[in-house]
Design a protein with these regions (language model features):
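Conserved acidic carboxylate
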Residues: 23
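Two-component/phosphorelay signaling modules centered on CheY-like receiver
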Residues: 26-44
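Acidic, metal-coordinating helix/loop segments flanking the phosphotransfer/catalytic sites
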Residues: 45-63
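Active-site residues of response regulator receiver
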Residues: 67, 95
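The feature encodes the CheY-like receiver
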Residues: 71, 99, 117
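C-terminal output helix
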Residues: 119-128, 132
Length: 137
């Protein structure tokens, strides 16, 4: 309730939002996971595309953040497989691949957004919150 006595709906909480983070660089993956956890998310880190897809099939996630260049299964392939199981889950690619063709391939494989490394962590956080808020409308 504000000072005028009006009620506002509660802002959506991120505390119960689960993110699948698939990143093969262990240092970067851990730093990003810790940042997202400190920002209020429940984050599961997978070290490659195969592990990421196995986790996706077993658990329920609200969003996926995928690297593109990974061993065993690249992020584009993983995104297509995720889309076959869930058409609506938000997918963000977070990658060093900056070529126009890669960005287009990312969107065509099911990505909702494509961020290049290095990136601004605050912008990533705003994109995540915005996508999750729209998903819950």
């Amino acid at each position: 309730m504000n000072m005028n006595g009006n009620y506002y709906p509660a802002k959506p909480s991120t505390e119960d939002k689960r993110i699948l983070l698939v990143e093969d660089d262990p240092n970067f993956g851990t730093v990003l996971k810790d940042y997202l956890v400190m920002s209020g998310f429940d984050v599961t880190l997978a070290k490659n595309g195969m592990e990421g897809f196995e986790l996706f099939k077993k658990e329920i996630f609200d969003m996926c953040i995928l690297d593109v260049m990974m061993p065993y299964k690249d992020g584009f392939t993983l995104a297509r497989e995720i889309r076959e199981k869930n058409e609506k889950i938000p997918i963000i690619f977070l990658t060093a691949r900056t070529m126009r063709e890669d960005v287009i391939k990312g969107y065509k494989s099911g990505g909702d957004d494509y961020l290049n490394k290095p990136f601004d962590s605050e912008i990533l956080l705003m994109k995540i919150r915005s996508m999750l808020q729209r998903k819950n409308i």
